[in-house]
Amino acid sequence: MTDSLPRNKALAPFAPLIGEWKMSATHPMLPGEHFHGTASFAWLDEGAFFVWRSSLDDPRFPTGVAIFGSDDERHEYFMLYFDERGVSRKYDVAIEGNTIRWSRNAPKLSQRNTWTIAADGRSVAGKGEMSR
């Protein structure tokens, strides 16, 4: 067995997100309010997976971590999420050009999110939707 794994080439579209980001966000259930925080993105195990850590400066929003991966046989992406409340969720992920979408359909809470990476790579615009 070798000490390092090869990079998962299917996750290459996530590379522009690597690093630390400042966040400014809104929430569909809290119209007119703006929230700030941080997000960081990094490779896990030399690129076998991609990790997202997020935290908003408002106690109403949990600090969370997500791991992105792929299924090479099905040509699909997924995200596994966990936060400080003990909530864990699985999301389906789609990548097209500079746009990353993740979603889940569940009886109690369905969610959709879209991130669009700017052409210059200096910002990411996100939009979230949810239904209960």
Locations of the language-model features?
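Hydrophobic small-molecule pocket/channel-lining residues, especially in calycin-type beta-barrels
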Residues: 1-132
